[in-house]
Structures are given as structure tokens and as C-alpha cells.
Amino acid sequence: MAKVAKDLNPRVQKMSLGQQQSARGVPCLRCKGTCSGFEPHSWRKICKSCKCSQEDHCLSSDLEDDRKIGRLLMDSKYSTLTARVKGGDGIRIYKRNRMIMTNPIATGKDPTFDTITYEWAPPGVTQKLGLQYMELIPKEKQPVTGTEGALYRRRQLMHQLPIYDQDPSRCRGLLENELKVMEEFVKQYKSEALGVGEVALPGQGGLPKEEGKQQEKPEGAETAPPTTNGSIGDPSKEYVCELCKGVAPADSPVVYSDRAGYSKQWHPACFVCAKCSEPLVDLIYFWKDGAPWCGRHYCESLRPRCSGCDEIIFSEDYQRVEDLAWHRKHFVCEGCEQQLGGRAYIVTMGQLLCPTCSKSKRS
């Protein structure tokens, strides 16, 4: 009898289950008060109460998000963006860059200050360039603490970078041979596709960080001449966005991808997933077919994703209907949860239903 992968790391598995239990009761952002609070399904990534996704309940915390990104970036060339957790048995955490803007407000004798905190900001740039970058992102997607933009970022971290696409202990019931396939899959994408975008002025992508922080030109200073490797921008050159083909002004930040090479750049709002067109959260991307993808859609482009549990399928034995796939054990009605293998079923708008539940839903 094959041994399931969750038994291979009981300590981490217990932590995963504990996190799920602690998330009970978290309100749904989509249902706006009609949901009684998150009630985890035993294997679907949804709330049993309202049927909305985990993302709609924003279950993760800053610490959980930083640990997840730290795990993703460790053992890759981007591990410098992580830090070792003291006493954490080799666990690394994401060194997330935050940006705090403090502006004085003139109100009588005692000065007061308006403070804005960005929960994430591009690393390795000056505050001025970081603020310029933020101003080029749609306001509703700027990750300012306490705003819809901060919630949007957290939801995208869950959606674009599912923890169960990189951590076998977060998958349910992996067989030992499937575990080996997954470990190789993760190792390969970290080596061949994973990337983190770099913010710089046009023509300055790829500079060492120490130099990169000097990207702002002092008033009255002469423009630096281009170097032989092209790392300093040529003032006579026109830089064009790889996506929209619009001009990138020389004094406005762009995003670079080392996987693409530093001859290509994107406007901040144009650095999006090639599949879903959503901005790439924290500039984390996966390079494929000459374009950046989010983690979710990159993984789906290589292997099928189960429409039931939302996990990547690492077995060659699974159920497929048109362009949808299921683990065989998850090929069940979304209404009554009965197994549908060998039985009549109906797929409507991506929902797998038995004839009875389908009829009930229509009425």
C-alpha cells in the first residue's frame, strides 16, 4: 500500500491543519455579511457556508504570506530576498519591503502628520522612485494599509501563488511517487522559470543594488554616458514597453525581468500575467513562451489542475471532461457530493453536478 505524502512531514502537516482551524469564522469579502463566517470544506478550497473561495475570506496573515514567499524563493537565485528564521530548521522568510510616507499637515500650533504605509514596495530603489512606481499602478490596486488595494494584494498572493503549488505538505493525499514528481516539478520551475521583476529607470535594469539606489539624478548633474554593457540609459534612445508598445519616459520607472533580458521593459501597470492579465503580485513571475505568467497559470500550462480541490494533478490517472480535469476521487457532484465516476453528470459553467442537483439548480 502506497504511503501518502502528508505522513512524511507530520510537523508541517499539523501546522497546516492548525492554520485552517484558526481561520474558522473569518467573514467573506464577497458575500458582504450574508456568510456566517468561514467554515472549511474537508478537501475543497472553499467555505462550506457560502461556497466562496478561501481567497474571498482572505485567510492568510502577513507572517503566513511572508513564510510562503520565503519558501518559494529559497533554493533559487532570488534567495537573497529571504532571511533565515532563527531556530526555524532552515525555514526562510520573505524580506518584504514596506514603504512609509509621512507628510506634515499644517493645523494650528501643533504639527500633525499624515502617514501612508504601503504593505509592499519594490526592493532596491529609493523612496522617490518607489513612490513614482506606486503612482503608475491603478489606485485601487496600490497596497496601502487599510484599503481595498491591500486586500487585493493579499487575495492575489493566494490566487496567483497557491501554497499547494510549491509545498507538498499542503497537498491532500499525495502518493509517494506523486510526491517525487511534484518535488522535481517545483525544483525545475525554480531553476528555469521563477523570477522577480526589478524596478529601475529605463536603461538602468541590471545594475548592482548599490548602484541601483543611485538612480535619481541630482539637480544640475549631467546625464551619465552609456557604458559598453548598456547598463546606463542612453538619453537619445527611445524605450518601448514590451506589452503595450508605448514609450517609457526616461524619468519614469519601468519593470525589468532578468529572464527576458535587459533589452525589454514594461510599464509598471503592464507587467501582468500573459494568461489572466492581472498585475503580477510583488512582481513575482514565471517566464514562459517569451512572456511573464503568474504562478497559478504557469503551473496549469504544464500540468492539469483539479477542478475539485484546486491542486495540481501529479498522477497520470485522472478524469478529464473537455478542458477540465479532476482527481478521480474528486470527481463528485458539487451539490450532493456523490461520486460521479461511471454515472451521469452535467458540467455547467465549470460546475460538476449530478442530474438531480443540476435540475434543482435550474429551477
From Swiss-Prot:
Residues covered by the PET domain: 99-206
Keyword vocabulary terms for this entry: Cytoplasm, LIM domain, Metal-binding, Nucleus, Phosphoprotein, Repeat, Repressor, Transcription, Transcription regulation, Zinc
Location of the region described as Disordered in the Swiss-Prot/TrEMBL record: 200-234
UniProt-annotated location(s): Cytoplasm; Nucleus
Basic and acidic residues bias spans: 208-220
Chaperone listed as a keyword: no
Main location: cytoplasm
Residues found modified as Phosphoserine: S16
Cellular component annotations (GO), alphabetically ordered: cytoplasm; nucleus
Pfam families: LIM, PET
Record Gene3D superfamilies: Cysteine Rich Protein
GO molecular function term, any single one: zinc ion binding
Record comment regarding domains: The LIM zinc-binding domains and the Cys-rich region mediate interaction with GATA6.
Stated name of the protein: LIM and cysteine-rich domains protein 1
Gene that this sequence comes from: LMCD1
